[in-house]
Amino acid sequence: MVTPKQIDFSSCGGGDNSDDTLSHRESPRNPSSKRAAASFAAEAGEETMKKKKKKKKKNLGPPLIVRIWNEEDELSILKGLVDYRAKTGFNPKIDWDAFYSFLGSSIVAKFSKEQVLSKIRKLKRRFHVHWEKISEGNDPKFTRSSDSEAFGFSSMIWGQGEFGNDDGMDKEMVKEHDVNGNGAAENGTARIAQENESGEEMLKEHEETLNENGAEEIRDNDETARKAQQLESESEEEMLKEHEEPFNENGAENIRDNNGTTQIAQQSESESEEMLKEHEEVANTELVNENGAAKTTENGTTGGKERHDDDDDDELCAVQDAFEAVMSQGLSGYQKKLQLEKLMNLGTGKRRELSDEWKALCVEERRLNIKKLRFSAKLAEAANDS
């Protein structure tokens, strides 16, 4: 039977060597702890960098916007524009250099011409927004006490919501931008914030002129055409009434001279008929000869037919305009087409009746809008004075 031997691990060299070996074994190496310490230091450094970046971002922040216009300045601009337009006879083209000089020293000393024009553009856009809300039956929700007064003055300048006249503001802004390079203006005082406009916005301005009766003439293509036709028909009727004076039994026509005296000129029946025909030609009325046929003009065209066609076109346009303004809302495209075709095929009498009634309603609506604008301006002034 084999007996196991015990192996002696002790060194043969003596006790000193044995102690060195044991001490060496009792202090093993630990490289993982060094790596952990290095990674911890790296993470701490990254967190420190992130905190520094966040502090820098907080310190930068958005730039402060300093308000350089106040409510009184805006009202002064609008009042000045109303007074200037009244002084220049409501000229559609505004001389902005002259207007800037027209403003008081309180505005000229604080703001440059470009800043004034930029503020007018913003006031105009603000008025457009309020006007659209009012037209839709919504409350404009004026947030400042001066907003109602500013709206009253703005309505006197750009009222009625029909914009399209060129007042030369775009060209003036482009010219100022070319002169100053980046659009900045200097008038001797430091400007904290420059109000710059971005994009290519097409400014449209509604200029209104008052005629002798106080009625407003709206310079819009369709409205101008309708009003011109209406004025033309009224002038034709007045001309006929002036010239178709009654004749006495002897065929004498009563003619009043400039001094108010009446002179009687004897004329034959044929001469009086010729005069009536001449006046009818001036009034563009239908010419009818003795046989009832339409009288032809020199170039061979029939004057009565042309006049009839013009009347038909005018009536059709009026009926179509009334349909689009009153009935077309809420209808689909197919429904609009069917309804419009039926209206276009109406009889002459019915179509003329609808056309005349719609024109009368348009005139009444314009007069009512004028009264509303004047009342709003008076109301704003009364509120400001009190």
Curated annotation (Swiss-Prot):
Expressed in the apical meristem and young leaf primordia. Detected in the vascular tissues of cotyledons and leaves, in hydathodes and at the base of flowers and siliques, but not in roots. GO terms for biological process: regulation of DNA-templated transcription. Its main location: nucleus. Residues 221-285 form a coiled coil. Homo- and heterodimers. Interacts with GEBP, GPL2 and GPL3. Interacts with GEBP. Belongs to the GeBP family. This is GLABROUS1 enhancer-binding protein-like 1. It comes from Arabidopsis thaliana. The lineage of its organism: Eukaryota, Viridiplantae, Streptophyta, Embryophyta, Tracheophyta.
